[in-house]
Protein backbone atom coordinates (compact mmCIF):
# COMPACT_ATOMS: atom_id res chain seq x y z
CA UNK A 1 0.00 0.00 0.00
CA UNK A 2 1.38 3.39 -0.99
CA UNK A 3 0.00 6.62 0.39
CA UNK A 4 0.20 9.26 -2.32
CA UNK A 5 -2.01 12.00 -0.89
CA UNK A 6 -2.76 12.84 2.72
CA UNK A 7 -4.07 15.81 4.63
CA UNK A 8 -5.52 16.88 7.95
CA UNK A 9 -9.19 16.57 7.11
CA UNK A 10 -10.73 17.58 10.42
CA UNK A 11 -9.90 18.71 13.95
CA UNK A 12 -12.75 17.89 16.30
CA UNK A 13 -13.52 18.35 19.96
CA UNK A 14 -17.25 17.57 19.79
CA UNK A 15 -18.96 14.65 18.04
CA UNK A 16 -20.86 17.09 15.81
CA UNK A 17 -17.51 18.20 14.37
CA UNK A 18 -16.51 14.71 13.17
CA UNK A 19 -16.33 14.08 9.41
CA UNK A 20 -18.92 11.74 7.91
CA UNK A 21 -18.52 7.98 8.28
CA UNK A 22 -17.98 7.27 4.59
CA UNK A 23 -14.34 6.17 5.04
CA UNK A 24 -12.93 3.44 7.31
CA UNK A 25 -10.89 4.75 10.24
CA UNK A 26 -7.98 3.35 12.23
CA UNK A 27 -7.38 5.11 15.54
CA UNK A 28 -4.21 5.50 17.59
CA UNK A 29 -4.25 6.12 21.32
CA UNK A 30 -1.57 6.39 23.98
CA UNK A 31 -0.29 8.51 26.81
CA UNK A 32 0.99 12.04 26.28
CA UNK A 33 4.37 12.43 24.56
CA UNK A 34 4.51 8.78 23.48
CA UNK A 35 5.09 9.68 19.83
CA UNK A 36 1.65 9.26 18.23
CA UNK A 37 1.94 12.31 16.00
CA UNK A 38 5.48 11.42 14.88
CA UNK A 39 4.30 7.88 14.12
CA UNK A 40 1.41 9.16 11.98
CA UNK A 41 3.75 11.56 10.14
CA UNK A 42 6.11 8.70 9.33
CA UNK A 43 3.30 6.43 8.11
CA UNK A 44 1.91 9.18 5.88
CA UNK A 45 5.38 10.31 4.73
CA UNK A 46 4.59 13.85 5.82
CA UNK A 47 7.15 15.48 8.08
CA UNK A 48 4.93 18.02 9.84
CA UNK A 49 1.35 17.06 8.98
CA UNK A 50 0.57 15.86 12.49
CA UNK A 51 1.74 18.50 14.95
CA UNK A 52 4.48 17.23 17.23
CA UNK A 53 5.87 18.73 20.41
CA UNK A 54 8.42 17.87 23.09
CA UNK A 55 5.87 19.18 25.57
CA UNK A 56 3.30 16.55 26.63
CA UNK A 57 -0.38 17.21 26.02
CA UNK A 58 -0.05 18.84 22.60
CA UNK A 59 -2.86 16.80 21.02
CA UNK A 60 -6.08 17.81 22.79
CA UNK A 61 -8.53 17.13 19.99
CA UNK A 62 -9.47 14.22 17.75
CA UNK A 63 -7.47 14.76 14.57
CA UNK A 64 -8.62 13.03 11.38
CA UNK A 65 -5.98 12.44 8.68
CA UNK A 66 -7.28 11.50 5.24
CA UNK A 67 -5.09 9.10 3.25
CA UNK A 68 -5.64 8.75 -0.50
CA UNK A 69 -9.28 9.66 0.14
CA UNK A 70 -9.65 5.94 0.94
CA UNK A 71 -9.30 5.81 4.73
CA UNK A 72 -8.46 7.94 7.76
CA UNK A 73 -5.86 7.67 10.51
CA UNK A 74 -7.19 9.17 13.72
CA UNK A 75 -4.92 10.71 16.35
CA UNK A 76 -6.64 10.70 19.75
CA UNK A 77 -5.67 13.02 22.63
CA UNK A 78 -2.82 11.74 24.78
CA UNK A 79 -3.72 10.73 28.31
CA UNK A 80 -1.84 10.67 31.60
CA UNK A 81 -0.02 14.02 31.54
CA UNK A 82 0.79 14.60 35.22
CA UNK A 83 0.72 18.41 35.10
CA UNK A 84 -2.84 18.56 33.78
CA UNK A 85 -5.66 19.46 36.18
CA UNK A 86 -8.24 16.82 37.11
CA UNK A 87 -10.98 18.67 35.25
CA UNK A 88 -8.82 18.89 32.13
CA UNK A 89 -7.94 15.18 32.33
CA UNK A 90 -11.63 14.34 32.65
CA UNK A 91 -12.38 16.50 29.61
CA UNK A 92 -9.74 14.73 27.52
CA UNK A 93 -11.00 11.31 28.68
CA UNK A 94 -14.51 12.24 27.57
CA UNK A 95 -13.22 13.29 24.15
CA UNK A 96 -11.49 9.91 23.72
CA UNK A 97 -14.48 7.90 25.00
CA UNK A 98 -16.95 9.79 22.81
CA UNK A 99 -14.97 8.95 19.70
CA UNK A 100 -14.31 5.30 20.57
CA UNK A 101 -17.89 4.55 21.62
CA UNK A 102 -19.69 6.25 18.74
CA UNK A 103 -17.72 5.69 15.55
CA UNK A 104 -19.39 3.01 13.42
CA UNK A 105 -16.66 3.14 10.75
CA UNK A 106 -13.87 2.44 13.26
CA UNK A 107 -12.00 -0.59 11.94
CA UNK A 108 -9.21 -0.90 14.50
CA UNK A 109 -7.62 0.79 17.51
CA UNK A 110 -3.85 0.65 18.05
CA UNK A 111 -2.24 1.35 21.42
CA UNK A 112 1.02 3.27 21.16
CA UNK A 113 3.57 2.89 23.95
CA UNK A 114 7.16 4.03 24.48
CA UNK A 115 9.47 1.01 24.20
CA UNK A 116 11.72 2.52 26.89
CA UNK A 117 9.07 2.40 29.61
CA UNK A 118 6.82 -0.13 31.27
CA UNK A 119 3.12 0.38 30.39
CA UNK A 120 1.24 2.52 32.92
CA UNK A 121 -2.00 1.69 34.68
CA UNK A 122 -3.80 3.86 32.13
CA UNK A 123 -2.11 1.99 29.27
CA UNK A 124 -3.39 -1.28 30.74
CA UNK A 125 -6.90 0.11 31.15
CA UNK A 126 -6.88 1.39 27.58
CA UNK A 127 -5.60 -1.92 26.23
CA UNK A 128 -8.21 -3.88 28.18
CA UNK A 129 -10.91 -1.66 26.68
CA UNK A 130 -9.53 -2.31 23.18
CA UNK A 131 -9.59 -6.08 23.70
CA UNK A 132 -12.98 -6.14 25.45
CA UNK A 133 -14.45 -4.08 22.61
CA UNK A 134 -13.51 -6.83 20.18
CA UNK A 135 -10.54 -5.21 18.47
CA UNK A 136 -7.38 -7.21 17.74
CA UNK A 137 -5.12 -5.40 20.20
CA UNK A 138 -2.21 -4.21 18.09
CA UNK A 139 0.55 -2.30 19.89
CA UNK A 140 3.18 0.02 18.42
CA UNK A 141 6.26 0.35 20.65
CA UNK A 142 7.76 3.64 19.49
CA UNK A 143 11.12 5.38 19.98
CA UNK A 144 13.07 2.27 19.04
CA UNK A 145 16.03 4.45 18.07
CA UNK A 146 16.27 5.67 21.68
CA UNK A 147 17.42 2.33 23.13
CA UNK A 148 20.33 -0.03 22.49
CA UNK A 149 19.80 -3.16 20.41
CA UNK A 150 20.51 -5.38 23.40
CA UNK A 151 17.52 -3.87 25.25
CA UNK A 152 14.90 -4.35 22.53
CA UNK A 153 13.87 -7.93 23.30
CA UNK A 154 13.92 -7.36 27.06
CA UNK A 155 11.75 -4.24 26.84
CA UNK A 156 9.31 -5.85 24.41
CA UNK A 157 8.92 -8.79 26.79
CA UNK A 158 8.13 -6.39 29.65
CA UNK A 159 5.46 -4.67 27.55
CA UNK A 160 3.95 -8.00 26.50
CA UNK A 161 3.89 -9.24 30.08
CA UNK A 162 2.29 -6.06 31.45
CA UNK A 163 -0.40 -6.02 28.74
CA UNK A 164 -0.90 -9.82 28.75
CA UNK A 165 0.03 -10.17 25.08
CA UNK A 166 0.65 -13.78 24.02
CA UNK A 167 0.90 -13.23 20.27
CA UNK A 168 4.16 -11.66 19.03
CA UNK A 169 2.36 -10.62 15.83
CA UNK A 170 0.35 -8.05 17.80
CA UNK A 171 3.30 -5.86 18.74
CA UNK A 172 5.62 -3.85 16.49
CA UNK A 173 8.76 -2.09 17.64
CA UNK A 174 8.98 1.12 15.64
CA UNK A 175 11.17 4.12 14.96
CA UNK A 176 9.59 7.20 13.43
CA UNK A 177 13.10 8.50 12.72
CA UNK A 178 14.53 5.52 10.81
CA UNK A 179 11.08 4.12 9.92
CA UNK A 180 12.12 0.70 11.17
CA UNK A 181 9.24 -1.75 10.68
CA UNK A 182 7.22 0.71 8.60
CA UNK A 183 6.75 -1.89 5.86
CA UNK A 184 5.34 -4.43 8.32
CA UNK A 185 2.98 -1.88 9.87
CA UNK A 186 1.79 -0.72 6.45
CA UNK A 187 1.06 -4.33 5.48
CA UNK A 188 -0.96 -4.75 8.66
CA UNK A 189 -2.94 -1.58 8.00
CA UNK A 190 -3.65 -2.83 4.49
CA UNK A 191 -4.93 -6.14 5.88
CA UNK A 192 -7.21 -4.34 8.33
CA UNK A 193 -8.64 -2.15 5.60
CA UNK A 194 -9.10 -5.12 3.28
CA UNK A 195 -10.83 -7.44 5.72
CA UNK A 196 -12.62 -4.90 7.87
CA UNK A 197 -13.03 -4.35 11.58
CA UNK A 198 -11.66 -6.74 14.15
CA UNK A 199 -15.00 -6.51 15.95
CA UNK A 200 -17.04 -9.67 15.93
CA UNK A 201 -20.57 -8.87 14.90
Swiss-Prot record:
Organism domain of life:
Bacteria
Q: Which GO terms describe its biological process?
A: division septum assembly
**Family statement drawn from the similarity comment of this UniProt entry:** Belongs to the TRAFAC class TrmE-Era-EngA-EngB-Septin-like GTPase superfamily. EngB GTPase family.
Molecular function terms from GO: GTP binding; metal ion binding
- Provide the binding site for GTP: 30-37, 57-61, 75-78, 142-145, 174-176
Which pairs of positions does the record mark as disulfide bonds?
none
Key words, A-Z: Cell cycle, Cell division, GTP-binding, Magnesium, Metal-binding, Nucleotide-binding, Septation
- What is the purpose of this protein? Necessary for normal cell division and for the maintenance of normal septation.
Give a Pfam family name: MMR_HSR1
Q: Provide the species name.
A: Finegoldia magna (strain ATCC 29328 / DSM 20472 / WAL 2508) (Peptostreptococcus magnus)
According to UniProt, the name of this protein is: Probable GTP-binding protein EngB
Tell whether Cell cycle is among the UniProt keywords: yes
Residues binding Mg(2+), per UniProt:
37, 59
The reply on keyword Cell cycle is yes
Which InterPro entries does the record cross-reference, listed alphabetically?
A: G_ENGB_dom, GTP-bd, GTP-bd_ribosome_bio_YsxC, P-loop_NTPase
